[in-house]
Regions:
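Core catalytic DNA strand-manipulation module of type IA topoisomerases
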Residues: 1-249
């Protein structure tokens, strides 16, 4: 059989990916029914949840069919979403598996190759933070990303350009020396990559975009929730409106 390195950092990921695959393989979809109504071109769904039998759903529907729908409450809440934390090995393996279907071992081999070519930092890490002494080097790394070219295009130029002309944001979610021991989170070195395979490029791209996003402001949004009722049965719809994309650009 194959020998897999079960290190302190790697075990949870392999277990996580294997467990997830087992869940997918063993998943048996079960049919269910929900009560829904259209009001002013918007679908509202009953808050009482799912019906496991069609008869049960039809019975509930028959009690409200043809009765008037009334809006009972409208609330609007503002919220923010912070940029995702930088990658450690585990979170990178999970994202590569989720987005590209790469195994934990494949991601590790790829990131090891990028590290050996001095394109990304040391990969076998279990921290998502940078030490404070890395901050002064970040503009230089950004400059390298700005110049990076893949197939005649510069995928990071616009993202980096938006951050130009002002000091980079220094967040405690990114820079915290107390959370770093021997090695820090995985980031690009700033050396523009050349001759990457498709797999290498995909892994590099995740790391580069995560690094750039760490210096962007929070994404700001508003969530509107509207409640209505028909004959004491409550219906609800929620919508999210982005007010300022921030790092989600």
């Amino acid at each position: 059989g194959q020998i897999l390195s079960i290190g302190r950092v790697q075990t949870p990921t392999l277990a996580l990916i294997v467990k997830r695959q087992e869940e997918i393989d063993n998943f048996k979809p079960e049919p269910y029914w929900v009560l829904a109504t259209i009001y002013r071109d918007t679908q509202f769904t009953a808050t009482k949840g799912k019906f496991t039998s069609k008869e049960e759903g039809e019975k509930a529907f028959s009690t409200i069919e043809g009765k008037p729908f009334t809006i009972t409450n409208v609330t609007k809440k503002k919220g923010t979403e912070q940029p995702k934390q930088l990658y450690d090995l585990t979170s990178l393996q999970v994202d590569c598996n989720r987005k590209y279907g790469y195994s934990a071992e494949m991601t590790l081999n790829t990131i090891q190759s990028l590290y050996e070519r001095k394109l990304t930092t040391y990969p076998r890490v279990d921290t998502q933070y940078l030490s404070d002494d890395i901050y002064p080097k970040c503009p230089q790394t950004m400059n390298g990303l700005f110049q990076t070219t893949f197939a005649g295009k510069r995928p990071y130029a616009e993202l980096v350009k938006t951050l130009g002309g002002k000091p980079l944001l220094k967040s405690k979610r990114v820079f915290d020396s107390s959370k770093v021991t021997d090695h820090h989170a995985i980031i690009p070195t700033g050396i523009p990559p050349q001759g990457l395979t498709d797999v290498e490029r995909n892994v590099y791209d995740l790391i580069a975009r995560r690094f750039i996003a760490a210096f962007y402001p929070d994404c700001k949004f508003a969530t509107t929730t509207v409640l209505g009722e028909v004959d004491k049965i409550e219906f609800k719809v929620s919508g999210k409106e982005i007010l300022d994309k921030g790092w989600r650009v």
